[in-house]
């Protein structure tokens, strides 16, 4: 095992000098020998003269020039397999839940090749979420990649938690949750919610269904940049065992941002809007590995923060290309008090195809979108001239569109503590029946308030009797 000496420290970036001919490879993990606690460096560049530039997987406080560093000769390796279930780990795979060490039989390197084209499989099997607007206009595929796009405070994390509640609890498979640069409070809440739901069992960890990997907001950029790969490596292991895995990543934008911080510290010239020049490649390295093979599937749900609500920002724009379904959250819908604030006109899915979902589902979804689009076009006329100037046909469109907008809302299980309304899981067949009736005009005489925050159409009709 070769050793070197620290020669320069710039924040989260450290230069280490090794003897000529024994220089570590890019992505090798180095251990700082004299550090108070375990500190790992990851090689990013070989800059000549036996010197390598590394990022620190932890705080660089207390580091000084001249400290001895050992080369492990391999990339960072993390525990994989069933021993990780029910546990909270950091970027290095160390347990941070005070429940003892993880004695996994196997460790995988976090840097791995994506599966080849021959190994990959594509599926058109639908994954029901129980959320009306998602199941109707942007249905998810089992083994697909789903992105939740939204600005600050429009409900990405709440929607993510509801999907975990509806899919992970209904789906008997295993899940991996990667918290990338998000709030520690949210990670804490998630852990306790999973315990209450029985998905995490502290007494009998082998009965748990979820592994959690956290690299939170307060951690150095190296941790936030690599924690998504740590979570993905654990999910890949379950997939290769022939299981169907759910991978939840909150938040992909923080992964990009950590890359930007590291890129600046490494001295690279920034590109558009100050992002790293390797943005597309870094995103591709992560996203290409999130895929289903002939052995098993990885279905991933990724929250993507949209800076200043600008979907053309390079970070969300780069993410779009990799996804099968995009769920776009809209601040204007949230401002009207309609939750979930998912925009049915902006949200898309490759699965919304008559060959996949069937002709009836496709026609209902497109009918809902065309009604809402027509209402959007008429809003300017209504604002200037009022409703009276519209033709009878347009008045009918507006009336139905307003009911559809209200019927797209529903109470969430995870928001029960705030709203006091019990959450509702709506099966797809009930969603389709409700919207089909609304488009056909079966409920033209029902007041629109009755459609707010209800599940099936029968619930709205019951509500109407009390109005």
Curated annotation (Swiss-Prot):
Belongs to the ATPase alpha/beta chains family. The keyword Cell membrane applies. ATP binds at residues 150-157. It comes from Aliivibrio fischeri (strain ATCC 700601 / ES114) (Vibrio fischeri). It catalyses: ATP + H2O + 4 H(+)(in) = ADP + phosphate + 5 H(+)(out). PROSITE patterns: ATPASE_ALPHA_BETA. It is found in: Cell inner membrane. One of its GO terms (cellular component) is plasma membrane. The keyword ATP-binding applies. This is ATP synthase subunit beta. It is a peripheral membrane protein. GO terms for molecular function: ATP binding; ATP hydrolysis activity; proton-transporting ATP synthase activity, rotational mechanism. F-type ATPases have 2 components, CF(1) - the catalytic core - and CF(0) - the membrane proton channel. CF(1) has five subunits: alpha(3), beta(3), gamma(1), delta(1), epsilon(1). CF(0) has three main subunits: a(1), b(2) and c(9-12). The alpha and beta chains form an alternating ring which encloses part of the gamma chain. CF(1) is attached to CF(0) by a central stalk formed by the gamma and epsilon chains, while a peripheral stalk is formed by the delta and b chains. It comes from the Bacteria. Its EC number is 7.1.2.2. Keywords: ATP synthesis, ATP-binding, Cell inner membrane, Cell membrane, CF(1), Hydrogen ion transport, Ion transport, Membrane, Nucleotide-binding, Translocase, Transport. Produces ATP from ADP in the presence of a proton gradient across the membrane. The catalytic sites are hosted primarily by the beta subunits.
